[in-house]
C-alpha cells in the first residue's frame, strides 16, 4: 500500500499542474490573456480543493451542486466524461504504480 501513497502524493501534483495548464490554455484558445487564464484556473483549482477538504460531501455531490440543468457546467462535465478524463487519470496512476514496483 505504501507505493500507492507515494504515487498519489508524489505524482498527483504533476497531474494537477497539467490540468491547470489545460484549463488555462483553453482560456487562451478562446481569447483570454495567458496570465489571466492561468490565474483563474489556479484559483478555481485552489477553491475546489478547499471545498473538498472542508466538506463532508463526496466530490460527485459537489459536481452535482454546481451543474445547473441544461447549463454550461453539465455540458463540460459530460464532455470530460465522454473524453475519458477518469480513465486517463486512472491509467496514469496505474502506470506510476507499475513503474514504482519495478524500481
Predicted regions and their residues:
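NAD(P)-dependent Rossmann-like dehydrogenase/reductase catalytic/cofactor-binding core
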Residues: 38-103
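Anionic-ligand binding region
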Residues: 1-38
